[in-house]
């Protein structure tokens, strides 16, 4: 099965794909700098030094003076690289069992520039949403695919802390070959994705106004101890968004915490969702307004854009 780079970018925002079970052999995970003194012994089901907290410089092994941060057989893709404190030591990425690295650049610049090496002039990426600085942590959400093998090394002086998030695909999947030229070739597609991330929450709302989407507007008053049907359907459908608009000035956490959402799918007797509205919309007592891809909150409105297909459904609030 051939997967294009555009297909990989689509996976980063398409909520419908979350409702499709992964293929046999597909798995996701993360390589990080966690303290290797922490370990688990499956033979005794015990943890050793689980409180070890030197999480800034762990690695798989050393190769001369470079640490190996990531190593995996393909096919797979690196989705995200993060560091709390990237510095000038180089990151090197090797793919497809090649001896020469596909990427060789200062770790800090990985979060600011297109990938480059000695043969290529530095080029600012200008992707504030694909390369955001969050709580001083640096992020890079630009996929790096590989078919047979991938290794990431870090030179001395690289900094502290890293995450490398990945998906490993079944052997039948064929991915595009990563190169420095690829990032330049797909810059328009990356710019479109960057804009999508900027419009997170807003774009999902607009997508749910399309012709093939039915929007139900409901007004409910729910007294203490009362249970009301929020929505019911005996026909196959997919819920793609749920909004809550408060009739008061603010959508207060205290009110959301008192109300519960319960969802039954396909005639089930046991509810599949049972939580407070605060939990459903990702709201805590101290939360301010925010917009993420699946959920968002403004002063008066909460929204969730989880894609939920079913043969029939019954939604209660109480």
What residue ranges belong to the model's regions?
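Short, surface-exposed beta-strand/strand-loop-strand elements in extracellular ectodomains
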Residues: 90-98, 254, 258-265
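Juxtamembrane membrane-water interface segments of multi-pass membrane proteins
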Residues: 141-143, 248-255, 262, 305-309
């Amino acid at each position: 099965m051939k997967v294009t780079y555009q297909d990989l970018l689509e996976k980063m925002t398409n909520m419908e794909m979350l409702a499709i079970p992964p293929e046999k052999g597909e798995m996701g995970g993360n390589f990080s700098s966690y303290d290797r003194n922490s370990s688990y012994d499956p033979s005794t089901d015990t943890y050793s030094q689980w409180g070890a907290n030197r999480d800034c410089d762990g690695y798989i092994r050393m190769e001369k003076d470079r640490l190996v941060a990531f190593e995996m057989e393909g096919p797979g893709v690196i989705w995200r690289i993060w560091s709390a404190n990237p510095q000038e030591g180089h990151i090197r990425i090797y793919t497809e069992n090649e001896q020469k690295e596909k990427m060789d650049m200062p770790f800090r610049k990985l979060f600011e520039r297109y990938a480059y090496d000695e043969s290529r002039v530095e080029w600012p990426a200008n992707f504030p949403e694909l390369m955001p600085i969050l709580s001083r942590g640096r992020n890079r959400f630009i996929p790096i695919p590989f078919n047979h093998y991938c290794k990431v090394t870090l030179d001395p002086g690289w900094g502290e802390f890293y995450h490398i998030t990945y998906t490993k695909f079944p052997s039948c999947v064929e991915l595009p070959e990563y190169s420095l030229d690829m990032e330049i070739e797909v810059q328009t597609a990356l710019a479109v994705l960057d804009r999508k991330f900027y419009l997170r929450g807003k774009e999902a709302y607009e997508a749910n106004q399309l012709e093939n989407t039915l929007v139900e507007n409901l007004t409910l008053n729910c007294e203490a101890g009362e249970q009301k049907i929020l929505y019911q359907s005996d026909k196959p459908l997919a819920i793609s968004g749920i909004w809550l608009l408060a009739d008061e000035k603010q959508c207060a956490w205290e009110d959301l915490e008192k109300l519960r959402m319960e969802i039954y799918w396909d005639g089930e007797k046991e509810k599949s969702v049972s939580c407070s509205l605060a939990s459903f919309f990702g709201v805590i007592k101290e939360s301010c307004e925010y917009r993420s891809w699946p959920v968002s909150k403004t002063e008066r409105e909460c929204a969730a854009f989880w894609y939920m297909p079913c043969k029939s459904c019954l939604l209660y609030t109480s």
